Amino acid sequence: MEFASAMEDVVLIETQEQWERLLDELGTLPCLAIDTESNGFFAYHERICLIQISTEATDYILDPLAVVDLGGLNRVFADPGIEKVFHAAANDISGLKRDFSFEFASVFDTAVACKMIGHRRLGLAHILEDHFGVELNKKWQRCDWGRRPLSDEQLRYARLDTHYLLPLRRQLLAELEAQDLLAQACEAFAGVCQVPAQEPRFLGNGINRIHGAGQLNRAARAVLRTLCRHRDQMARQRDRAPFRILGNETLLRLAERQPRDLDELYKIKGLPKTFRKGAQAKRILSLIRQGRSDPDPASASPAEPAADDHPPSSQPLE
């Protein structure tokens, strides 16, 4: 708690000039804490919207939507002489590679270390509570980090994701050494550095990530595939997460009940108003007829890949 009491104001980096000055400093340090915030719960084309960087002295929040050239950060991430401390690094590294083509060396993943040591609760909120008595406000966990301006509350939340990682790393390093696990941990950390960049993709026949799809008959599965393709197309055009166009539970109900007219369609629970009338409603009915009349046996395998690369939600935004 002594570390927390010394917390200074977070420094928001919003200009190229600010960033260049900070970059010069980062290149001289032996260890940094890193985290990112993205907008994957809101946008189809997910992108990193914040990069949090903590040193032993200061918490920085870098706005990649405002700072044009972040190329210099690759020198830091790829430098084996600068250790980068993440919690559950794979997702952050994958996104940073996707958006900026960064390379990584010398990573310490506190989530991997905690798992090796034997911690049962691996989420950062639980780890910080266990080690520092700190409670994270989960209100901002899934907010739209692509919206500007950022509130003071958002900045406070974001900075806590990295503020404690350096002292946490020191504690975990000692535990890894005490249990003779450091060499094994270093191998795992090196593997995390090789995580590939992941692009959002829609595999047209893949519907098995939708809970309950496996219990549908062939015709209903064909309807579900057709609706998924349509949802994906709309999501791409609007740059919205697919589950915010139509929730997975709603898609499943449509595939199960296969309404034949507007009256039956209107009764589908969870269907947004925009799909209950007009052109959108007629399009949904047409897609259901299309799927029902043309089931594809080749794509009815239980081993199908995932249809929806975004988190499911039972309450899509209208």
Predicted stretch roles:
Residues T15, A88-A89, G247:
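Helix N-cap/beta->alpha junction signal
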Residues S38-H45:
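Single-stranded nucleic-acid-binding OB-fold domains
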Residues M1-L32, T36:
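N-terminal accessory regions of nucleic-acid-interacting proteins
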Residues A33, F42, L50-I53:
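Non-catalytic, usually N-terminal nucleic-acid engagement modules in DNA/RNA processing proteins
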Residues Q52, A57-L166, R170-L173, C193-A197:
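Active-site-proximal helix-loop-helix substrate-binding element of RNase H-like nuclease domains
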Residues L12, D63, F86, A158, ...:
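Active-site-adjacent beta-strand anchor residues
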Residues D152, L172-E318:
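Accessory DNA-binding and partner-docking regions appended to nucleic-acid-acting proteins
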